[in-house]
Amino acid sequence: MPSGRLDVELRLSLFGLTRSIDTRRFARYRNAVVVLASALLVIPLTLWLLSPAAVPDLAHGNIAGARALADGWAKGEMIVLVRHVERCDHSKAACLNDREGITDRARAVAVGLGARFEQLGLDNADLYNSPLVRATQTAGYMFNKVGSGDDWLINCRHDFLRNALAHKVAGRNLILVTHSECMQAMETALQRPTSAFGYGASLFVSTAQPQAPRLLGFIEASDWRSMTFP
């Protein structure tokens, strides 16, 4: 056997046969396998790094997020989208008074949400709501007042961000009682992955730089109790 030759003799006694496997024939594929394996690891990592970051949860000890929300609210820089509370036609719970509206048990949730916004301050806030019953009822129990209803808070697949900015008054926060589709439309407009928001969730958008609004984060209805504002 020549020097340096890496042959492995595999002798098979079965039927008296002897076979030889030359490992050199596999060496040519080794580099290709290494490159392929590396690519399989690198490509998903690259896609993950380049994908838009998820919208931050402002609750559960997110001190920096809570501080940014409080500061932005005090300056009248915020747009907040509030999803209506539990809708009756998608629930087995008792309706408040209209099947197209909210459930009876959701009334307390809306009142509680309103109290949270009262703590933030409503003197420098403007309120708009979708004209659908579930949104008007939510707004009514949150703020003891209801707007006439704006169609752009229902049909929100196009120009939703532009419409929101057009209704935002400098130095005043804008509260929009709307629907999950509109919240997702806002995320899409700001190039963020869409989220599945629960009933009564609030999505906050900072307009500190009016030409470059950014999603600050969200708070689910049940998570306000964990919020700590500086």
Task: Walk through the language-model features, giving the residues of each.
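Active-site-proximal alpha-helix that buttresses catalytic centers in soluble enzyme cores
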Residues: 4-150, 156-159, 167, 183-185, ...
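Generic beta-sheet signal
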Residues: 78-79, 170-178
